Design a protein with these regions (language model features):
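Core dinuclear metal-dependent hydrolase active-site scaffold
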Residues: 1-3, 60-118
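Active-site environment of divalent metal-dependent phosphoester hydrolases
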Residues: 16-20, 43-44, 81-82, 105-107, ...
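Short acidic-hydrophobic, aromatic-tinged amphipathic segments that line or gate anion-handling sites
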Residues: 56-60, 211
Length: 219
């Protein structure tokens, strides 16, 4: 994990090891940092990952909180964790949406993320690559389930729906995130998402639709 020395806070989405294994180290290295997580996540967090209690700020998934001049609105997501969340961060009239580790995007989640100016969206795997990989059957079934991870195809469909539900000119920046190192590549994710958008005619009206798609985190 790399941080600026003056960073103020860490927000935890859920207790799975790939998201918290460095948390205790970060807490010791940056004792000034505030660490935010849901009450359920704190309860499920293993002792060897827990930072000092005085750094911890617990929240309910339906209650907003403030970090500096940023308003944070957590929301529940669909993952096999105790109380997993995504986030909407708002400052003035700009919004950042963050959602990874969810098996599907329900209507409630969609309403939360559709107005984000910058959306960090999971595109975890290519479904066919996952089905052919060496993972045990139970692991594959978990990933593909409604409490697993969303695929490149699902990410593309979510972005289509955002555009189709929007009125007037649309500008969005999207970072595809939480990509599997075994079952995805940034190039594969970009190609799939762009192909889905093109099939729906959403790249043919640049005066109305503008999407900037990049990639951010690979797991």
């Amino acid at each position: 994990m790399l941080f600026r020395s003056d960073f103020k806070a860490v927000m935890i989405t859920h207790e799975h090891t790939d998201h918290v294994k460095g948390l205790r180290i970060v807490g010791k290295k940056y004792p000034h940092a505030e660490i935010y997580m849901s009450k359920g996540t704190w309860t499920a967090l293993k002792d060897n990952y827990r930072p000092e209690k005085n750094q911890i700020h617990l929240f309910h998934p339906k209650e907003k909180f403030v970090i500096g001049d940023v308003v944070v609105a957590p929301f529940s997501i669909h993952h096999d964790a105790v109380e997993p969340v995504g986030f909407i961060l708002s400052k003035k009239n700009k919004k950042i949406g963050f959602i990874t580790d969810t098996g599907h995007i329900c209507d409630e989640i969609f309403e939360r993320i559709k107005y984000a100016d910058l959306l960090i969206l999971e595109a975890n795997h290519d479904e066919e690559v996952l089905k052919m990989c060496s993972y045990p059957y139970e692991v594959k079934r978990r990933i593909l389930s409604e409490i697993g991870h969303i695929s490149n195809i699902t990410a593309g469909r979510v972005l289509c729906r955002i555009l189709e539900d929007s009125e007037g000119p649309v500008y969005r920046q999207v970072l595809l995130a939480h990509m599997s190192m075994e079952n995805n590549t940034p190039e594969m994710a970009h190609l799939t998402v762009e192909s889905i958008l093109r099939e729906r005619g959403l790249f043919t009206f640049p005066s109305r639709y503008y999407f900037s798609i990049g990639h951010w985190v690979v797991f």
